C-alpha cells in the first residue's frame, strides 16, 4: 500500500476511519496502564484523532506520527491551536503545547526519536496496513520503543476474504506473534457487526473489536 493511497483519501475527504468522539476503549482502559504524569506517548498513524487531545488532557506529552499534511493541519485548525513548525530529519514537526505531530513516513522513525516514549496507543494503525506492512510495523515498534513501554492496541477481527480492506482484519494470534517480545493481554472483545452495514452487506457474520494491553 503506497503513501499516495492515504494522501488521496485525505484529499478526497474519504476518512471514514476518523471518529467524531474520543474512543471509549481509550477512556475505559488507558488508566490501567498507570503511566506517570508527563509520560510521552507514541500514537502511530494518528490522523487528526480527538484521542490526541484527550491524551494530552490526561497530562501526557503526545507524539503523533501522520503521513498526511492535510490531517496534521486539520488537527491544529479544528482545535484552534497555532503550531510551531520545524524540520527534524525526515519529518516536519508541528508542535503546540504537549502535542507534537510528526508529518512523514512512520517507517522513517529512529530509536532516538521515541527513546522516551513509555506509552503506545494504536487505535487505527495496525488495522490500516496490509499483512506484510503490519508485520514490519510491529517489528519496528518492538525495536524502537524502550523496554519500559506500555500500550493499548485496538484491532478488528473478521473474515478477510469478504472485504479487501482497509480496515484489515488482525487475528489474535497474528497480533501476539507480531508483538512476541511483549506481554499481550486481551482486555475486551466486542461484537459490532450490527453497527457495521458495510460488513453486513459483504456477507460478514461477525466483526469483533478487540482491545489489548501491551507491556514488557
From Swiss-Prot:
It is found in: Cytoplasm. GO terms for cellular component: cytoplasm. It is an enzyme of class 2 (transferase). Keywords: Cytoplasm, Methyltransferase, S-adenosyl-L-methionine, Transferase. It comes from Pseudomonas putida (strain ATCC 700007 / DSM 6899 / JCM 31910 / BCRC 17059 / LMG 24140 / F1). The gene is tpm. One of its GO terms (molecular function) is thiopurine S-methyltransferase activity. HAMAP family: Thiopur_methtran. Pfam families: TPMT (PF05724). Its EC number is 2.1.1.67. S-adenosyl-L-methionine binds at residues 10, 45, 66, 123. One of its GO terms (biological process) is methylation. This is Thiopurine S-methyltransferase. Belongs to the class I-like SAM-binding methyltransferase superfamily. TPMT family. Signal peptide: none annotated.
Amino acid at each position: 500500500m503506497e503513501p499516495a493511497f492515504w494522501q488521496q483519501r485525505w484529499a478526497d475527504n474519504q476518512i471514514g476511519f476518523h471518529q467524531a468522539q474520543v474512543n471509549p476503549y481509550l477512556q475505559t482502559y488507558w488508566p490501567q496502564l498507570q503511566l506517570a504524569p508527563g509520560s510521552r506517548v507514541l500514537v502511530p498513524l494518528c490522523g487528526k484523532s480527538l484521542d490526541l487531545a484527550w491524551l494530552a488532557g490526561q497530562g501526557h506529552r503526545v507524539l503523533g506520527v501522520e503521513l498526511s499534511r492535510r490531517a496534521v493541519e486539520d488537527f491544529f485548525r479544528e482545535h484552534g491551536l497555532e503550531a510551531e513548525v520545524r524540520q527534524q530529519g525526515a519529518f516536519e514537526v508541528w508542535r503546540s503545547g504537549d502535542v507534537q505531530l510528526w508529518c512523514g513516513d512512520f517507517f522513517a522513525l529512529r530509536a532516538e526519536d521515541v527513546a522516551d516514549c513509555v506509552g503506545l496507543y494504536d487505535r487505527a494503525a495496525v488495522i490500516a496496513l496490509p499483512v506484510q506492512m503490519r508485520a514490519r510495523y510491529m517489528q519496528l515498534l518492538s525495536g524502537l520503543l524502550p523496554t519500559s513501554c506500555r500500550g493499548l492496541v485496538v484491532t478488528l477481527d473478521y473474515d478477510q476474504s469478504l472485504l479487501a480492506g482497509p480496515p484489515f482484519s488482525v487475528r489474535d494470534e497474528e497480533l501476539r506473534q507480531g508483538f512476541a517480545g511483549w506481554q499481550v493481554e486481551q482486555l475486551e472483545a466486542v461484537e459490532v457487526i450490527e453497527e457495521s452495514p458495510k460488513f453486513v452487506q459483504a456477507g460478514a457474520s461477525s466483526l469483533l473489536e478487540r482491545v489489548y494491553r501491551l507491556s514488557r
